[in-house]
Amino acid sequence: MRHYEIVFLVHPDQSEQVPQMIERYRGMIESDGGHFHRLEDWGRRQLAYPIKKAHKAHYVLMNIECSSVALAELEDAFRFNDAVLRHLILARDEAVTSPSFLARDETDRRERSEETAEGEGEPDHSANEAVVTA
């Protein structure tokens, strides 16, 4: 079995259907003996240019290991699903399990917001104070 990295974009009106779509694709891959190594739901994001009159799309990233038969079935599912605006399938040499840069940015933002929420109280204005010398 080979390793693949897959990104697909779902029409924003169908964002509620993304978890069911992921489960359907997971079933297709695992029924053929494949494995998921990474699954990231990046949520709605702005597109660089409109696709089918949509300016936003729901992004999903998957790193999988599957046979060519399961991959062909998955690609057909993407092609015939009108909710999938675009998809990209890349062959990888090995399984990628580390978080993507978008997922890392999101966790960094969450950690920073938690730190500021814990440290609320008197704001520290020492950096804003001007030093006056006579």
UniProtKB/Swiss-Prot annotation:
A GO cellular component entry from the record: cytosolic small ribosomal subunit
Biased composition, class Basic and acidic residues, residue ranges: 103-115
Family: Belongs to the bacterial ribosomal protein bS6 family.
Single GO BP term: translation
Annotated region described as Disordered, given as residue ranges: 100-134
Organism whose genome encodes this protein: Acidithiobacillus ferrooxidans (strain ATCC 23270 / DSM 14882 / CIP 104768 / NCIMB 8455) (Ferrobacillus ferrooxidans (strain ATCC 23270))
Pfam families: Ribosomal_S6 (PF01250)
Described purpose of this protein according to its UniProt entry: Binds together with bS18 to 16S ribosomal RNA.
GO molecular function terms attached to this record: small ribosomal subunit rRNA binding; structural constituent of ribosome
Record InterPro entries: Ribosomal_bS6, Ribosomal_bS6_CS, Ribosomal_bS6_sf, Ribosomal_S6_plastid/chlpt, Transl_elong_EF1B/ribsomal_bS6
Keywords: Ribonucleoprotein, Ribosomal protein, RNA-binding, rRNA-binding
UniProt protein name: Small ribosomal subunit protein bS6
